[in-house]
Amino acid sequence: MTDNRVVITGLGAISGLGITADDFWDAMKSGRSAIQKLDLPIENIKISLGSTVPDFEPENFFSSDELSILDRYSQLAVIAAQEAVNDAGLICGENILSNAATIIGSGCGGKHTDEDTYLQLYKHNKTRAHPLTIPKGMPSAAASMVSMHLGIKGPAFGTASACASGSHAIIQGMTMIKSGITDTALVGASDAPFTYGLLKSWDALRVASDDTCRPFCNNRSGLVLGEGAGMMVLESAESAHQRGAKIYAELAGCGMTSDAGHITRPDIHGITNAMEKALHHANLYPDEIDYINAHGTGTLVNDATETEAINRVFGVYAKKLAVSSTKAMHGHALGASSALEIVATAQAIYHGIIPPTVNFTEADETCDLDYVPNVARKKDIRAALSLSLIH
């Protein structure tokens, strides 16, 4: 058993903000939101807003044979994963990549495949499903497809924990490197939730905004869904230094908890416990954190509870923290949100710029922190914390 330091050497992102990590970061710096009116051929849906990948033509990235086995969420995962590998300066076929782990989370998996299958069977009265329906739509499909496309032959599997799926994938990769199981891991998450069945289900939850996503504001009215994938290459610090790799940030520690309570209502004790565990694991004091990338969904309950949890953990220092939610820019991409937010946090540390909370008007009386309203802020960031919750 070892205790290797773990660093981020490659980033990939595809979202409503664009098809590359550079597009993603440019939007973060400028405070541009991708939330807009949905243009989908779907009737009887109350949800009218979303953040979808702009001008996305899968045929520009994949052959017709490849598309026959790739659900939309796997397509997004492969594109972002390829970018992260290229950004890290790794080459397919090299030992460092061939032996890497591939761990990719998802909150909902291949829902486009499921929906297409249901339409064929129940609307068009087909008598059989496509023979590749199962491998195309399974929750681990993205991990398998990324592994196959990049020739990665280390362990490949998925994680599923709702909005924290990406964080858990990244933590798993970090843990495997720290323990010496592998030197390199390609990790992240992908989700593509814009299907009739999922949108009707989100309608039923009654947490979606018909205005826009305004985290921590007194007139916030709910979340706005998004789609996308965030990927990163993790390496042991020794491996990265040996090959002269660019290092965005170090993953110093993590904290994971369960509320063991209500399935949708957050418990402040679980949130505070997770942050305290992360600080302890990273050997950091609260006053060494300069930035928190918040879960910040824009719902009444989440934002107030999250703010109170930060106040409890950081005490008087909480008012000196910069806290922002990037969901107001890229939307709530379910399991992919946590991965996209860790990509944003790594970029913030590397570039010394804190992404803003856009669409910000006036803070709620229960939300009393510095939420970096509307305009990005230059700041040397010693350490940052990314908070992903499951509600």
Give residue spans per PLM region.
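Phosphate/pyrophosphate-binding loops at sites that engage ATP/ADP/AMP, CoA/4′-phosphopantetheine
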Residues: 84-96, 240-244, 275-291, 313, ...
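Conserved beta-ketoacyl condensing-enzyme motif
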Residues: 8, 24, 29-161, 190-198, ...
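Condensing-enzyme catalytic core mediating Claisen C-C bond formation in acyl metabolism
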Residues: 5-9, 32-36, 208, 212-282, ...
